[in-house]
């Protein structure tokens, strides 16, 4: 078997082809550049975010212990062993921030919300979202992530760590306490990432796919943190260069690696919807979009006749494409008045006998230029005009013709 034949065999393998699809999306979304931007934003907003979270918890005395558990969790997750000095500085800054005036406190909240908005925008770009949530809905989501998310995590961590310690002592094997604690941290890291991947994008994300992406990312984060700690403990040449400031550059490197893995997990999660039916082999090929638009409208027409609305999952059962690409088509059709999204799902605004195929073709494939036409435009127009004339029919007429070919 030649080398080219082996490469062709890898390309035909479903797992290898899907892995290559994820890698290409990782590159197309410019994850390293996005991670670098998120690192800088986190560096500016980490102290305000922790301050706001702990300040909200301090309003309810019963949450004090749980907020401490959350801060400890952040210390273990964000700051690897060897860069502990950085977190000492962060805690010192956070304590100083408690003495701020009302205007300073407002700025802390604004800075914290800006970090969450940056995360939201980055995730929506990965999921190819064009329409943002209403402003009030965005604020409620951001505030929930900033307050109730950490408090819930703190409650869970406190409960789990206590249960782990009790189980280890009851079994007479306290040496397992560290392993169980790591498992507990890994569990809640997975839940936190699941919440991010499931609810932050303004796009439908199946719970199972969000869990798979979160679990893979949590394992990668824990492995990276262990390797980072091992390196800093065994190779201390960097200390002779940076001296007392050695923890700072490594903290920045770790933040960058952390965001690269988290955003990489988001890319993986958004790509999982392409696994079914091997839709990843087509990828984001725009050549079949007109066909997909017709399938979407025909499905909605059939549902309209039955008095039903269609959720996004129903489209995916009939059309071989990812949820992000499907969402783009639905949003574009909605912007141009063909469909709308209700509580139960998507609904056709008009009947199939009122939808002209040539107008859809102009919207998704080719639209003649009305002004400033040079010789190239005129030549293309001459070629495409017969095609547009052929498509001079309604969706209902096209449906009748298509059914004759079954």
From Swiss-Prot:
The record's Gene Ontology cellular component field reads: plasma membrane
- Transmembrane parts of this sequence: 43-63, 100-120, 139-159, 176-196, 210-230, 248-268
Return the Pfam families for the record: Virul_fac_BrkB
Q: Look up keyword Secreted and say if it applies.
A: no
Q: Does the keyword Transmembrane helix apply?
A: yes
Q: Where in the cell? A: Cell inner membrane
Q: List keywords of the entry alphabetically.
A: Cell inner membrane, Cell membrane, Membrane, Transmembrane, Transmembrane helix
- Identify the InterPro entries for this entry: UPF0761_bac (IPR023679), Virul_fac_BrkB (IPR017039)
> Which domain of life, per UniProt?
Bacteria
| Topological type in the membrane | Multi-pass membrane protein
Q: Which family does the entry's similarity section mention?
A: Belongs to the UPF0761 family.
What PANTHER family does its record include? INNER MEMBRANE PROTEIN YHJD (PTHR30213), UPF0761 MEMBRANE PROTEIN YIHY (PTHR30213:SF0)
Q: What is this protein called?
A: UPF0761 membrane protein NMB0524
Provide the species name. Answer: Neisseria meningitidis serogroup B (strain ATCC BAA-335 / MC58)
Tell me the organism's taxonomic lineage. Bacteria, Pseudomonadati, Pseudomonadota, Betaproteobacteria, Neisseriales
